[in-house]
């Protein structure tokens, strides 16, 4: 058999040869073609929707919005996440193929926002449900900030190795797709001392400790398994 002669690289051919690794080639192809899943629940999604217009044109970053989680590799949670919506969000994330990424957009998604103080149905941070790669604060963040978050995610993907793509099993997560909620009753029963309620006006200065009689058979109102 004739021996195979490899061409000698000279100055005329060195510019047409690309030296890379399979890992870098895979990272480059993924960061240049992110397919986000449209998941908006509040006003933050209005800012994300403005990226589709000609002013910002997020198509130049290779973003192709998808409506199916099985065709997406990026989910951008924009808006408030409630307890009732949490199992659906986890189910969508689990249906996305690996490798997959998450951008938490807005204060309501990251910490619960203004609804986290007195709302019983708001999740205080989406990272309690699914792992988050990039946090994007704001109320709501501007479209320029969304582009900056996508750029940071692209830089993270470019530095990934194969072991980084294998997501560890979620530990200490609050919800799963088959999670059952059990609400513990509040220790504050609201029972008042009838004698104090019908006391004359001269006894208006009553200490707070003696006005309410609370029973505390259980701990404070919380969600338990």
Curated annotation (Swiss-Prot):
Catalyzed chemical reaction(s): a plastoquinone + NADH + (n+1) H(+)(in) = a plastoquinol + NAD(+) + n H(+)(out); a plastoquinone + NADPH + (n+1) H(+)(in) = a plastoquinol + NADP(+) + n H(+)(out)
Cofactors, names only: [4Fe-4S] cluster
EC number(s) reported in the record: 7.1.1.-
Note describing how the cofactor binds: Binds 1 [4Fe-4S] cluster.
Annotated Gene Ontology cellular component terms: chloroplast thylakoid membrane; respiratory chain complex I
Binding site for [4Fe-4S] cluster: 43-44, 108, 139
One BP term from GO: electron transport coupled proton transport
Pfam families reported for this sequence: Oxidored_q6
One of the record's GO molecular function terms: 4 iron, 4 sulfur cluster binding
Signal peptide span: none
Keyword terms: 4Fe-4S, Chloroplast, Iron, Iron-sulfur, Membrane, Metal-binding, NAD, NADP, Plastid, Plastoquinone, Quinone, Thylakoid, Translocase, Transport
InterPro entries: NADH_UbQ_OxRdtase-like_20kDa (IPR006137), NADH_UQ_OxRdtase_20Kd_su (IPR006138)
SUPFAM superfamilies assigned to the protein according to its UniProt record, in alphabetical order: HydA/Nqo6-like
Keyword ATP-binding found: no
Membrane topology: Peripheral membrane protein
Subcellular location: Plastid, Chloroplast thylakoid membrane
Assembly notes: NDH is composed of at least 16 different subunits, 5 of which are encoded in the nucleus.
Family note: Belongs to the complex I 20 kDa subunit family.
HAMAP family noted in UniProt: NDH1_NuoB
Function (record text): NDH shuttles electrons from NAD(P)H:plastoquinone, via FMN and iron-sulfur (Fe-S) centers, to quinones in the photosynthetic chain and possibly in a chloroplast respiratory chain. The immediate electron acceptor for the enzyme in this species is believed to be plastoquinone. Couples the redox reaction to proton translocation, and thus conserves the redox energy in a proton gradient.
Protein name: NAD(P)H-quinone oxidoreductase subunit K, chloroplastic
Species name: Barbarea verna
Underlying gene: ndhK
């Amino acid at each position: 058999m004739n021996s195979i002669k490899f061409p000698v690289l000279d100055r005329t051919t060195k510019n047409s040869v690309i030296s890379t690794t399979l890992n870098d080639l895979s990272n480059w192809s993924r960061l240049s073609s992110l397919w986000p899943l449209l998941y908006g629940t509040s006003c933050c999604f209005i800012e994300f929707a403005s990226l589709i217009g000609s002013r910002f044109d997020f198509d130049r970053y290779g973003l192709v919005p998808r409506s199916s989680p099985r065709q997406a590799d990026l989910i951008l949670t924009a808006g408030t996440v409630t307890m009732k919506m949490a199992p659906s969000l986890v189910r969508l994330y689990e249906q996305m193929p690996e490798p997959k990424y998450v951008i938490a957009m807005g204060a309501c998604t990251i910490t619960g926002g203004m609804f986290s103080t007195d709302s019983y149905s708001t999740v205080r941070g989406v990272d309690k449900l699914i792992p988050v790669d990039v946090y994007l604060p704001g109320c709501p963040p501007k479209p320029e900030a969304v582009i900056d978050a996508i750029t940071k995610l692209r830089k993270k993907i470019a530095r990934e190795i194969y072991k980084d793509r294998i997501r560890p099993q979620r530990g200490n997560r609050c919800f799963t797709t088959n999670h059952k909620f059990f609400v513990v009753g509040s220790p504050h029963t609201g029972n008042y001392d009838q004698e104090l309620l019908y006391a004359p006006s001269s006894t208006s200065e009553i200490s707070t400790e003696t006005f309410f009689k609370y029973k505390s058979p259980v701990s404070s109102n919380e969600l338990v398994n």
